[in-house]
Amino acid sequence: MELYIITGASKGLGQAIALQALEKGHEVHALSRTKTDVSHKKLTQHQIDLINLEEAEQQFETLLSSIDSDRYSGITLINNAGMVTPIKRAGEASLDELQRHYQLNLTAPVLLSQLFTKRFASYSGKKTVVNITSGAAKNPYKGWSAYCSSKAGLDMFTRTFGFEQEDEELPVNMISFSPGVMDTEMQAVIRSSSKKDFHHIERFRKLNETGSLRSPDFIAGTLLSLLEKGTENGRIYDIKEFL
């Protein structure tokens, strides 16, 4: 049995990963701002606001200290929580909007990954961290200066972390995984923005109208299959590789 720790697990991709991991017989710690009505004997829900970094650090350390690692053949952290807003051109977002965005999309996953690595330094089982990224990490979009740059930063953290872990006797394996366009609440937020703020809005509206958005269940299954087969440390994976 393995243990999965998943952020942003109350909806969308995070919830799909959690439910499928439970179906496979694994235990899940689900982190989100709001708890869901999902009940399972192997599911533990934690109400954590990752934008509040100091509080999140304390709560996550408490969670990690409660884990008996000897019970698991592998432990995986999936940094899934994120936001696309502010959808605005550079120069138009407020300080508060930028702080919230980068704290959730970049600083929080870096912080949680560090805490995870320290806590399980002597653990000899399989240790994995997955950072959910986006094609926006490589491709600029007008109106997504914050989102593109935060995901690009997260990908470089993945690459650097993997490079550093080559020096470790019991390394943590970290990857980034780009799920592509999914039928989630984030896509609804994108479609509700304006042409002025987001130049590519019509493309994303068309993806929805033509049924081209992939389901979170499909993406979750693909990711879990990849993790079962094994991954290359520091690599950026894209869903397009598995279609």
From Swiss-Prot:
Family, as annotated: Belongs to the short-chain dehydrogenases/reductases (SDR) family.
Catalytic residues in the record: 147 (proton acceptor)
E.C. number(s) listed in UniProt: 1.1.1.320
SUPFAM superfamilies: NAD(P)-binding Rossmann-fold domains
Name of the molecule in the record: Benzil reductase ((S)-benzoin forming)
GO CC term (a single one): cytoplasm
Sequence positions that bind NADP(+): 6, 80, 147, 151, 184
Localization of this protein: Cytoplasm
GO molecular function: benzil reductase [(S)-benzoin-forming] activity; sepiapterin reductase (NADP+) activity
Known catalytic reactions: (S)-benzoin + NADP(+) = benzil + NADPH + H(+)
Top-rank EC class of the record's enzyme: oxidoreductase
Keywords: Cytoplasm, NADP, Oxidoreductase
GO BP: tetrahydrobiopterin biosynthetic process
Main function: Reduces benzil stereospecifically to (S)-benzoin.
Taxonomic placement: Bacteria, Bacillati, Bacillota, Bacilli, Bacillales
